[in-house]
């Protein structure tokens, strides 16, 4: 064996280290351990007992993360390091990519063999997506709404997930009510002025009453990362009809989608391009979702009789790739509906 083998082995195992570490960080959050440690140093036996965890196994798990410098262990006392504490704001990305899609990555070979789409944990995908949106999509939609002729009286979120995105839009407004539509929508409203309907967007719009007087100019519909799912699951025609139906009901439709540019070297040389969008693009190849380009969506909106009032991208301080795009749509004058 040549003397360089071990060095090459260490390099070859770095993706395995990353795989285990991503799982470890996700479960640090998911187990409730992170919240306890965020309050300050804890005694492992007492913390484990209060969370219903096995103390011996928990100690081994915490030791693993201490070796990666996310925790500091001294006897039975454990605390977050500065590196560990800094993880807090990024929890939603782990909930989405690890919690929501861990099972998806395990099915890659099956999908390549043509055995259908890979599965995912829809509940955790929704939780992670809503949490991430507080940093990118939520401010983006607020900017789109600022371009409305007047502040809306109500918002209909056609793919609301766990409802936190919608709650963030209406929180503190006092005059705005929200309706959340999603198969995984909460059974009960977490706040006054919100109500939820457990339904798919196309079914809801098909069954909803269209105002006899025309679109309600005081209402806006929202489709954040929704059209990509309808496109793959129900086809282009269903997306066109969804846009038309939303604009028959409401004065405006806000859409947020991801520009599909996986073969663009400029994107893939970007740090966030490799860290987030490269796996994100892969996941959409494997699951029942379909990303498309900015040009594709513009053409589809035209076909649906919609006019793009304004187009914006996510805050570059959060995402400077320009890939997360928001559109504010209204009915094009004279277009068939």
Curated annotation (Swiss-Prot):
Q: Which InterPro entries match?
A: MrsA (IPR030899), SAM-dependent_MTases_sf (IPR029063), WH-like_DNA-bd_sf (IPR036388), WH_DNA-bd_sf (IPR036390)
Q: What is its EC number?
A: 2.1.1.243
Per the record, the pathway is: Antibiotic biosynthesis
**Regions annotated as coiled coil:** none
Broad enzyme group: transferase
Q: Which domain of life is it from?
A: Bacteria
Q: What family, per the record?
A: Belongs to the 2-ketoarginine methyltransferase family.
Q: What is this protein called?
A: 2-ketoarginine methyltransferase
Tell me what organism the protein belongs to.
Streptomyces arginensis
Please name the gene that encodes this protein: argN
